[in-house]
Amino acid sequence: MSTESMIRDVELAEEALPRKTAGPQGSRRRWFLRLFSFLLVAGATTLFCLLHFGVIGPQREEFPKDPSLISPLAQAVRSSSRTPSDKPVAHVVANPQAEGQLQWLNRRANALLANGVEPTDNQLVVPSEGLYLIYSQVLFKGQGCPSNHVLLTHTISRIAVSYQTKVNLLSAIKSPCQRETPEGAEAKPWYEPIYLGGVFQLEKGDRLSAEINLPDYLDFAESGQVYFGIIAL
């Protein structure tokens, strides 16, 4: 039964009341009928809104687990997410046995060379033109502060094929010592990490290097503290 039919029935019932109910008792009856009509309309309206906005009604269907029921587009998205990338990438780590220098190694745990990146003369050679994320981190460690001011530098440089000149892409300087350790005072250890990272347009054949000025302060106590890498975007 529709809402209009229910309202019409109530109106007919009200019209069918004997005319003698015009007194106080008849007024109460008409008032109750009007109240009942209002509640009926309000309830029907509420039910319609709940059904319309999906608050009540049939539950949503779960995503089918059977591959045959999955749309071709969804299958294509899933398969593409599993396709290995063919973009150049490199991640090299420092050689802890190289004294007095920062030497990069690619044949170590957690190191990686893929899709054309080659190490040459402690540098990474870019295999193809494009945008690259270049990054590097070093960790310095010392004991106490000497009389001469300690300045720690870390630099990522580029030698482009178009102009054979070394150009700094990223650079940072830190000083672990604000003042000299007084004579006789305890020489406390200090640590200074430097991280560099940025996105650059590179050409095929460009050579990239990550260097420091004081390799004797490098800390190799833990793996993953000193590294250098590039990722094609």
Swiss-Prot record:
The modification Phosphoserine is found at residue 2. A lipid is attached at residue 20 (N6-myristoyl lysine). The chain crosses the membrane at residues 35-57. GO terms for biological process: extrinsic apoptotic signaling pathway via death domain receptors; immune response; necroptotic signaling pathway; negative regulation of protein-containing complex disassembly; positive regulation of apoptotic process; positive regulation of canonical NF-kappaB signal transduction; positive regulation of extrinsic apoptotic signaling pathway; positive regulation of JUN kinase activity. One of its GO terms (cellular component) is cell surface. Glycans are attached at residue 80. Its main location: membrane. This is Tumor necrosis factor. GO terms for molecular function: cytokine activity; tumor necrosis factor receptor binding. Cytokine that binds to TNFRSF1A/TNFR1 and TNFRSF1B/TNFBR. It is mainly secreted by macrophages and can induce cell death of certain tumor cell lines. It is potent pyrogen causing fever by direct action or by stimulation of interleukin-1 secretion and is implicated in the induction of cachexia, Under certain conditions it can stimulate cell proliferation and induce cell differentiation. Induces insulin resistance in adipocytes via inhibition of insulin-induced IRS1 tyrosine phosphorylation and insulin-induced glucose uptake. The TNF intracellular domain (ICD) form induces IL12 production in dendritic cells. Residues 1-34 are cytoplasmic. Disulfide bonds join 145-177. PANTHER family: TUMOR NECROSIS FACTOR, TUMOR NECROSIS FACTOR FAMILY MEMBER. Belongs to the tumor necrosis factor family. It is found in: Cell membrane. SMART domains: TNF. Residues 88-233 form the THD domain. Homotrimer. Interacts with SPPL2B. Residues 58-233 are extracellular. The soluble form derives from the membrane form by proteolytic processing. The membrane-bound form is further proteolytically processed by SPPL2A or SPPL2B through regulated intramembrane proteolysis producing TNF intracellular domains (ICD1 and ICD2) released in the cytosol and TNF C-domain 1 and C-domain 2 secreted into the extracellular space. Keywords: Cell membrane, Cytokine, Disulfide bond, Glycoprotein, Lipoprotein, Membrane, Myristate, Phosphoprotein, Secreted, Signal-anchor, Transmembrane, Transmembrane helix. It comes from the Eukaryota. It is a single-pass type II membrane protein. The record marks 39-40, 49-52, 76-77 as: Cleavage.
